[in-house]
Amino acid sequence: MTKLARNLTAVIIAIFIVVMMVLLASSTLREENHLEGNLSSTLAKAPNNLEVMTVMPTDVYGEEYPAIGFICPGMREDKVKEAQIDTENITFEDGAVPEGKSYAVAISQSAKPFIEELDPKKVEVCEMIDMQVKAMEQQGQSLDGGVPMIQGTQPLGFQREDGTWKMVA
């Protein structure tokens, strides 16, 4: 091997080592919050010609959040607290969530729950939640005003209607 080839090989190896060190350093300096996104931004990124979309909560919020709950208008503050959800970032009027407000709550076993306020003009989940709660009540079951939870591996179906993503399943 010529002297030029040896020097070129040494430079390439040195550059490779520096790149690997930078990658290692950047991965160790990452923020501890592994939250990958939120429901609103995930649905907003869907192509305009897509009218139906299925998402998995774990794909939206990350594997660390194995369940998602929805807080809808009329839900009582004491019932939300019973579900061990910090109500600091949730708006209540007269002890209940007011009309026009809804929230998605990503639940983690090891991290603080992530609360996302949903804009009902962009993402509507409460119509479906209300229908499911009424169906449960007709069968003699009750949430007793609590927060409905969905496992992170259970798909959530959404359909776009007039620019609003509505949960349909």
Regions of interest found by a model, annotated:
Residues 125-169:
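C-terminal partner/receptor-binding element of secreted or periplasmic proteins
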Residues 7-11, 65, 74-78, 114-115, ...:
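Aromatic-enriched hydrophobic runs in primary sequence
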Residues 26-27, 40-41, 102, 108-110, ...:
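Generic serine detector
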Residues 2-83:
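N-terminal export/targeting and maturation segments
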Residues 19, 83-88, 130-131, 136:
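Generic alpha-helical propensity signal that fires on short helical segments
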Residues 57-126:
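Mature extracytoplasmic domains of secretory-pathway proteins
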